[in-house]
Amino acid sequence: MSDKDLASSLMELNIKVGTTDIPQTIAEEQNQVTDTKEEVLDDETTIKNDPQKTKITLNQSMMLSKLPAKTTSAVLSVSKPTESKIQIRFKSIGSVDQVSPAVFKISKSSKFSSILRFLELKLGKKVYCYLNNSVSPNPDEELENLYNIFRVGDELIVSYCNIVAFG
């Protein structure tokens, strides 16, 4: 058996057994040793260089105090916390019973189908819903988008009835 045949059969054995991470040359072996040292050094340096997270208000920030007035107002308006819930007011149309209480809060990320299900469970019958007595939204629409477009004041008005009322 020649050296080439022996080397190829050893390579096949390594592939079959799954020990392909054995270094084939001295250079590969040296690279593996240096890689492990770099990993240890990287772990130590990231621990040492990891900054401590502190909460500094926008009014206390040195960088923001030196910004122009327009930029500061833009940053402050963007950084205000947003509400995660929106207010929904239900209004009945026709002979359908009024849901009580008429005002609810729901998550912005919810779909309009959750309102349909809620009303159908509360009333015990199928309902047709409209926003501002004009638009019947798709059940897959997110409430946040509908709220941004159709809100009146600080609430979304959802009218409902048991028959098709508009259009």
UniProtKB/Swiss-Prot annotation:
It comes from the Eukaryota. GO terms for biological process: autophagosome assembly; autophagosome maturation; autophagy of mitochondrion; glycophagy; piecemeal microautophagy of the nucleus; protein transport. InterPro entries: Atg12 (IPR007242), Ubiquitin-like_domsf (IPR029071). It is found in: Preautophagosomal structure membrane. It is a peripheral membrane protein. The keyword Cell inner membrane does not apply. GO terms for cellular component: Atg12-Atg5-Atg16 complex; autophagosome membrane; phagophore assembly site membrane. Keywords: Autophagy, Isopeptide bond, Membrane, Protein transport, Transport, Ubl conjugation pathway. There is a cross-link at G167 (Glycyl lysine isopeptide (Gly-Lys) (interchain with K-135 in ATG5)). GO terms for molecular function: Atg8-family ligase activity. Forms a conjugate with ATG5. Belongs to the ATG12 family. Ubiquitin-like protein involved in cytoplasm to vacuole transport (Cvt), autophagy vesicles formation, mitophagy, and nucleophagy. Conjugation with ATG5 through a ubiquitin-like conjugating system involving also ATG7 as an E1-like activating enzyme and ATG10 as an E2-like conjugating enzyme, is essential for its function. The ATG12-ATG5 conjugate functions as an E3-like enzyme which is required for lipidation of ATG8 and ATG8 association to the vesicle membranes. PANTHER family: AUTOPHAGY PROTEIN 12, UBIQUITIN-LIKE PROTEIN ATG12. This is Ubiquitin-like protein ATG12. It comes from Pichia angusta (Yeast). The lineage of its organism: Eukaryota, Fungi, Dikarya, Ascomycota, Saccharomycotina. The gene is ATG12.
